[in-house]
Amino acid sequence: MTRGAWRCIIGWLICIGGTPVASVAQAPETAVVMLGTGTPNADPDRSGPAVAVVRAGRSYLVDAGPGVMRRASAAAALHADSSLQPRNLRILFLTHLHSDHTVGLPDLILSAWTLERDVPLEVYGPPGTQAMVDHLLAAYAADIRNRIDGLEPANPTGYQVRVHEIAPGKVFEDGNVTVTAFAVPHGDWEVAFGYRFQSADRSIVVSGDTRASDAVVRACDGCDLLVHEVYSAERFQTRPPAWQAYHAKAHTSTTELADIARRAAPKQLLLYHQLFWGTTDEGLIAETRAAGYKGPMRSAADLTRY
């Protein structure tokens, strides 16, 4: 790649608010890498929802949307972060079981194994997670047996999954980060979660899919970074009535997010899972500003680091 091309890539990362690899040394020890910022819409520039919290050589994933493995590999190279290499993807937290947040799960189970992960994948999620994993392993049973019993030098443990079906409260602690799950309202799902990650140097909250909720305000409460989903309030009226009814119950508008963020008071607000409907990153930020939020705010793109 030419020097000019690299300058273009670094300039693009700076413009959308992320951190290029040259600046990683100045970043906090605990960082967020946006592996996927998309929605069910087939946007070629945005993979499905997947957020990585990285610290001290370990990675912790929130959701596994389509494309998660390839985005993680790309991020590992771009940010010189070995914790995002396939064999080191070992811990996953699922917010809920919608397909756009879980289609990458079999990839995370099986591809990371074939690329030398030799420990079981730890998956934390709502009730139903165990059944999903059981069905996935059954679906790929022939593949697994072929790799283990055939000529391929596959290890016997890396495809295994340890599922932890969780309830709100502290769900994980390893001396590096502490993870707390909190319930959020998302459409017709009986159980959906957001997550708060607390480390020695930073507090990070990932909303997951949710309509405007005081639970996010309580979980953040002045956190360092709030990663929150959003849709365009201005473009909402262009949607068919049935979709308007759904989105109003399942997601958070720019107008609503302005109020949530004002009360949650994060040091930085990061938009993701953006439903643009014809607007832009700048448009979403402008809508949120117009609704009264004045704090630091960015709109995330895939592969950016914060």
What are these regions (language model features)?
Residues 25-205, 216, 283-306:
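Binuclear metal-dependent hydrolase catalytic cores
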Residues 194, 201-203, 211-304:
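Cap/insert and terminal regions of metallo-dependent hydrolase folds
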Residues 1-5:
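N-terminal secretory signal peptides that target proteins for export/translocation
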Residues 7-20:
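Bacterial N-terminal signal peptides
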